[in-house]
């Protein structure tokens, strides 16, 4: 029997500064993966996390 999908989803958080910032420490776009509860958080997540490419704490938005 196939099991039902759980409430938790795996999402990807992407740095918003990496797309526009040209003065970066290294090229590329930083992404984090995390999970969220589908029932408690229905909207898109925005978290402030460290970006090694920008070398600062920046806002990371949910993309998937």
Curated annotation (Swiss-Prot):
A Pfam match: Ribosomal_L33
Gene responsible for this protein: rpmG
Family: Belongs to the bacterial ribosomal protein bL33 family.
Top-rank taxon: Bacteria
Species: Crocosphaera subtropica (strain ATCC 51142 / BH68)
Cellular component, GO annotation: cytoplasm; ribonucleoprotein complex; ribosome
GO biological process: translation
Entry-linked PROSITE patterns: RIBOSOMAL_L33
Family annotation (HAMAP family): Ribosomal_bL33
Stated name of the protein: Large ribosomal subunit protein bL33
Keywords per UniProt: Ribonucleoprotein, Ribosomal protein
Matches recorded under InterPro entries: Ribosomal_bL33 (IPR001705), Ribosomal_bL33_CS (IPR018264), Ribosomal_bL33_sf (IPR038584), Ribosomal_zn-bd (IPR011332)
Disulfide bonds: none
GO MF annotations in UniProt: structural constituent of ribosome
